[in-house]
């Protein structure tokens, strides 16, 4: 299922933060493998589903079970990096960079023009 770029980016950020916590808590865990095959546990579920961005833009994700969130993460990884070189590894970091770039493009091409139009129409109403 496709979600807004900001929601997917938030999910990747929450998962990345959790992988960093796990790597610091347990030095036997490989940071590289955590970036390629992240652990999605209840801590990720609680942080993500309670976040205000999720409540605002994807409220259907607030009631997810752990298995469903794990499936969402697997789906994001399976989609990969559209438009990137084939030899680019799919990791939490490369995915986050990819979705960050998509979100910036979305803001520049869609959201900012809408805001500009609203401001211009509001300014026109005042005169």
Swiss-Prot record:
One of its GO terms (biological process) is chromatin remodeling. Its main location: nucleus. It is found in: Nucleus. Keywords: Activator, Chromatin regulator, Nucleus, Transcription, Transcription regulation. It comes from the Eukaryota. GO terms for cellular component: Swr1 complex. Belongs to the SWC7 family. Component of the SWR1 complex which mediates the ATP-dependent exchange of histone H2A for the H2A variant HZT1 leading to transcriptional regulation of selected genes by chromatin remodeling. Component of the SWR1 chromatin remodeling complex. This is SWR1-complex protein 7. It comes from Eremothecium gossypii (strain ATCC 10895 / CBS 109.51 / FGSC 9923 / NRRL Y-1056) (Yeast). The lineage of its organism: Eukaryota, Fungi, Dikarya, Ascomycota, Saccharomycotina. The gene is SWC7.
